[in-house]
Amino acid sequence: MKKLIAIILALVMVLSLVACGNKADAPATEAPADEPVAVMTYAEYAAAELDTPVVIDCYVQAHQGWWFDGDAGHGKLTVYAADADGAYFLYELNVAEEDVAKFTTGAKIRVTGYKGMWDGQVEVMDGTFEFVEGDTYVAEPIDGNALLGSADMINYMNQLASFKGMTLESKTYKNDGGDDIWLTFSNNGVSCSFTVEVYFTGTDSDVYTTVDAMEIGDVADIEAFLYWYQDAADCHIAAITPAA
């Protein structure tokens, strides 16, 4: 009897060791990796929820000045971009200084970041990029006059628009000069806000010096990107021509 019990106990121990060995040899189960986000069309980007990852192919239309963010440890460049279906505002894209010269008008880039909103302005935040070889694209400005006073203007956010025969109603200098200039222009009694964004134009540009010299009541033709601020259009001026 004692011998039988000893045999049974020995078998139990052997089976236990085999089970433990199999368990130790089994590969660890890995958590499934996040699926990479596919390149989106403009319609897919527009429909994406805020604070979600986005990947877009787009074309550089213009950009603001490059600067180095010491806290982040890398350079930043804010870019106005577009494709044939819409436009994008790429806020503080991670860009090395040596790459800035390659951000020529029409250059194609692939941007990975997050869709965000600040004071009504929809933009790509925390973005990285890569240059994409191939075609180039420069968007023609849309008719801004047709959108003045229209709730439909927001559907064209970030696109370049052309405004004809705009009368200067007000002009305010941020920090008493040498910085942004805040403006109100109107056409046929409908007003719209515009800004000379110094990070975009600088103070020695034709845009800045032209606006600086304008007086209330002066008329000009304007090209501007449809930027949003405090839930209303506040267009960033890219070009301005005083009326003859």
Name the predicted role of every residue range:
Residues 1-9:
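Positively charged n-region of N-terminal signal peptides that target proteins for export
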Residues 16-19:
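C-terminal motif of bacterial Sec signal peptides marking the signal peptidase cleavage site
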Residues 21-23:
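Bacterial signal peptide processing site
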Residues 31-244:
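OB-fold single-stranded nucleic acid-binding module
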